[in-house]
């Protein structure tokens, strides 16, 4: 579960850059990139550190999303969007889908291991 949570922070950090925001990246951020090996969990930050970075990145992202203009959303994306428009808008839409997919994985794993549900 820790890898998925770290991957979500990694992805949100990337989205902050795509929408023109700035956030200080943690040195461990690249441990959670797409295709990263999960062999050495001892190098991972603890869940509290990941959670704290999630909050920081999310605050910056929400502020920047609320500031975006239609013109900015229509600009080409610096991220190669696998499906949909190759614009900032398309990147936001794709990464929103990506995030909900992984949050669903976390919810399923929590249930499987007997933890309380994430919400509700």
Please provide the spans of the model-predicted regions.
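Acidic/histidine-rich alpha-helical segments that form the ligand environment
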Residues: 37-75, 90-95
């Amino acid at each position: 579960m820790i890898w998925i949570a770290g991957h979500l922070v990694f992805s949100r950090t990337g989205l902050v850059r795509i929408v023109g925001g700035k956030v200080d990246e943690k040195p461990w951020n690249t441990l959670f990139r797409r295709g990263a090996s999960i062999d050495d969990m001892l190098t991972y930050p603890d869940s509290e550190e990941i959670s704290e970075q999630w909050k920081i990145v999310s605050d910056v992202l929400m502020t920047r999303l609320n500031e975006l203009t239609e013109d900015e959303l229509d600009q080409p994306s610096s991220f190669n969007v696998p499906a949909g428009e190759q614009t900032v808008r398309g990147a936001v839409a794709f990464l929103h889908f990506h995030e909900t997919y992984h949050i669903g994985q976390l919810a399923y794993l929590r249930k499987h291991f007997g933890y309380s549900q994430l919400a509700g």
